[in-house]
From Swiss-Prot:
Keyword Ion transport: no
Keywords: Cytoplasm, Methyltransferase, rRNA processing, S-adenosyl-L-methionine, Transferase
Function of the molecule: Specifically methylates the N7 position of a guanine in 16S rRNA.
Class of this enzyme: transferase
Family the entry assigns: Belongs to the methyltransferase superfamily. RNA methyltransferase RsmG family.
UniProt-recorded name of the protein: Ribosomal RNA small subunit methyltransferase G
Subcellular compartments: Cytoplasm
CC per GO annotation: cytosol
E.C. number: 2.1.1.-
Binding site for S-adenosyl-L-methionine: G78, F83, A129, E130, R148
Gene3D superfamilies listed in its UniProt record: Vaccinia Virus protein VP39
């Protein structure tokens, strides 16, 4: 997907990018490739692949109408090089985006990226999702949490649901169908007082399969969740 095709595909779906937004995506691509030689950010570095499999893939929740250009607080867990939240932030600048990542080198990249792209209302923190979720400045403070190919729902739900406000939503992007995952996650979702409200498969323009799952927080999360760092992975709920 060449940049021009990316712009046209968005325009066809009602999103007209400004010259500034086009420049932001172009600079994002350049910095991603440049920094990828120093630290491992992505295996995808060819321009048309980055525009398709990182930029276009990341904005599926926008294209499908799940996120609007409103001053919502969005947390991205394990965003790596900023996906999916920063492409969404470029298109919908009103979003207030927070990223937590366990690797400090990636956080350094994100700080530089945000400065270069002149993004405002973005916040980056180095650490584990399990730890920040017990901090009152983070717990139950977000309207939305996004996660792209981070972990199975059984694990992901414990890492993310505590951050949501009541009736806030987790938006999980996956590369394959999530049906089996959701069956395995039933117990975790029950314990966390959360419910799957949408789950559907779709394809990228090149035919690659994708799944988008939305989980809503129905009641306050019990204080014991999430458990200590490493436990959700070691012993899923």
């Amino acid at each position: 997907m060449k940049p021009e095709v990316f712009y046209k595909t968005l325009a066809d779906q009602g999103i007209q990018l400004t010259d500034q937004q086009k420049h932001q995506f172009h600079r994002y691509f350049q910095l991603l490739v440049e920094w990828n030689e120093k630290i491992n950010l992505t295996a995808i570095t060819e321009e048309s692949e980055v525009y398709l499999k990182h930029f276009y893939d990341s904005i599926a929740p926008l294209l499908q109408g799940h996120i609007q250009n409103e001053p919502l607080r969005l947390l991205d867990i394990g965003a790596g090089a900023g996906f999916p939240s920063l492409p969404m932030k470029i298109i919908f600048p009103q979003l207030d985006v927070t990223i937590i990542d366990s690797l400090n080198k990636r956080i350094n990249f994100l700080h530089l990226l945000a400065e270069e792209l002149e993004l405002e209302g973005v916040h980056f923190y180095h650490g584990r999702a399990e730890d920040f979720a017990q901090d009152k400045n983070f717990r139950a403070q977000f309207d939305l949490v996004t996660a792209r190919a981070v972990a199975r729902m059984q694990i992901l739900s414990e890492l993310t649901i505590p951050y949501l406000k009541l009736h806030g939503k987790l938006i999980a992007l996956k590369a394959s169908s999530a049906e089996d995952e959701l069956t395995q996650a039933k117990n975790a979702l029950n314990l966390l007082f959360a419910k799957v409200i949408e789950n559907h498969d779709y394809t990228l323009p090149n035919g690659d399969p994708r799944t988008l799952t939305i989980v809503e927080k129905k009641k306050e999360t019990p204080n014991k969740f999430p458990r200590k760092a490493g436990m959700p992975n070691k012993r899923p709920l």
